[in-house]
UniProtKB/Swiss-Prot annotation:
Residues 1-23, 55-88, 168-195 are annotated as: Disordered. It comes from the Eukaryota. Residues 1-15, 59-88 have a biased composition (Basic and acidic residues). The keyword Transport does not apply. InterPro entries: Znf_C2H2_sf (IPR036236), Znf_C2H2_type (IPR013087). A zinc finger (C2H2-type) spans 220-244, 250-274. Keywords: Metal-binding, Repeat, Zinc, Zinc-finger. GO terms for cellular component: chromatin; PcG protein complex; transcription regulator complex. It comes from Encephalitozoon cuniculi (strain GB-M1). One of its GO terms (molecular function) is zinc ion binding. This is Zinc finger C2H2 protein ECU05_0610.
Amino acid sequence: MLKNRVEVDRRRLDFSEESSAGEYNGKYLGFHEQAGETGTYRKVIYSQEGKLVPPQYHTWDRNPHHKDTSPSDKKYHSEYREGESDSRLDTPISIEAKWSHYSSEYFEASDSEEFDEKLASLRLLILEAEEEMRRIVQGRVDKHLEMNKEANEKKKEMKRRKREVLGEVNKVRGEAGDRDDRSCERPEEESDAKGTRIESFADFETSMFPYKSKNGAKSYACPYEGCTMELPTLSRIKRHYIVHTKLRPFKCLNKDCNKRFSRKDNMLQHYKIHCNYSNYR
């Protein structure tokens, strides 16, 4: 310990002599090791040959009334810290501190610029995606409208052709109707007689079928012997009864035709053959 203290004193004397002789560069950079009211700072000095002079640690005080000690003052306190490695002599601590300060600012600026670039690229990608989606949707809408337009045109064409065909059919039917009216003319007395026979037969049929009501349900019973069929409507029971009797009361209205039918609708359907309606059934 005593040996180290002697070495420090010797270096301090050498430093004082060199500072008075002006053989070193007096410019130095320091840093504060503590953030309190008092602390130490290290002074780094380079000689004219470029060699690093061992660092000196000086005390400092934040008190504004305190006077800083100058390097030429013999009363300033300096010490050489024990236990420090020789690597500190190779690289100036002040340069390291200054570089760390500027490097942190540089990295912060570079990070901010990089973030702005990424944000701008992300916004550009979003805009491109929205534009692409807009094009896709618009394309589908246009395609749908085009398909609807084609379908509507086809429907219009089909309706036009249908009107033309129906017009031709109605024209032919009108001409055929005029001929049928002339060919189907019959004496008024004959038609009245046939109508009377049909009506009387219908009345006779109606009186044949007794009406029943059971628990609010209507029904007509078949009058044929041995048949127990009951149907809810008169028309149905009539059709059923004709199966038993084999009656064909409805004769064709054409005087040249002798066909007879069990139902009036069947007779009228047959009568259209004589009126040239067979092509339109």
